[in-house]
C-alpha cells in the first residue's frame, strides 16, 4: 500500500551511543536514516574502531552536514574537510575526526544501518518495524 509516512529523529527507532558520540536512527521505505552527533575530540580510530575492529571505517557515507567541522582522510592519504551545508560522499577506507571545539551534527542516508556496532553483529541492513 502506498501511503505517506513520517518519523522523527527526536524519537528514533534506535539510538547507538559510543565514545564521544551518538547516532539516532529511523527507517522508512527500506532506507536507514541517521543523525550523528559527534563531540569535540571524537575520532573514528579511537572512538569507533574498538567496536568495528577494522583498520579504518569500512562504511560508505552519504552525508549532509548541519553544524561543526569534520575532517576525513582516506587510506590512500587524501583528505577533505566538511562543514555546515556540505554534502559529502565518503567511501569505505577512511578515518575521520571533529575539527575544533564545536560538535558535529550530520545526517547520513547511506551508511548508518550497521554503524558503530560490534564486529560480531551480523552484516546486512538493520531491521525495523513500522
Set out the residue ranges of the language-model regions.
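Short, conserved beta-strand element in jelly-roll/cupin
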Residues: 38, 54-72
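Short acidic-glycine-tyrosine-enriched beta hairpin
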Residues: 74-94
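Short beta-strand segments in beta-sandwich/barrel cores
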Residues: 43-44, 68-73, 96
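A short hydrophobic beta-strand segment most commonly corresponding to one strand
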Residues: 35, 89-90, 95, 101-119
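Conserved short histidine dyad/triad with adjacent acidic residue
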Residues: 35-57
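A short, N-terminal "cap"/entry segment at the start of jelly-roll beta-barrel domains
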Residues: 1-37, 45, 121-130
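Conserved hydrophobic/aromatic beta-strand scaffold that supports enzyme active sites
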Residues: 15, 25, 33-37, 62, ...
Amino acid at each position: 500500500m502506498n501511503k505517506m509516512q513520517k518519523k522523527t529523529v527526536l524519537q528514533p527507532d534506535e539510538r547507538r551511543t559510543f565514545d564521544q558520540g551518538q547516532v539516532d536512527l529511523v527507517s522508512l521505505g527500506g532506507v536507514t536514516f541517521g543523525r550523528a552527533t559527534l563531540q569535540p575530540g571524537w575520532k573514528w580510530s579511537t572512538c569507533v574502531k574498538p567496536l568495528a575492529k577494522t583498520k579504518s571505517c569500512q562504511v560508505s557515507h552519504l552525508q549532509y552536514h548541519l553544524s561543526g567541522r569534520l575532517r576525513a582522510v582516506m587510506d590512500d592519504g587524501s583528505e577533505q574537510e566538511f562543514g555546515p551545508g556540505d554534502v559529502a560522499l565518503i567511501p569505505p577506507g577512511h578515518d575521520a575526526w571533529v575539527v575544533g571545539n564545536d560538535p558535529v551534527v550530520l545526517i547520513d542516508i547511506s551508511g548508518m544501518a550497521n554503524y558503530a556496532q560490534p564486529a560480531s553483529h551480523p552484516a546486512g541492513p538493520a531491521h525495523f518495524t513500522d
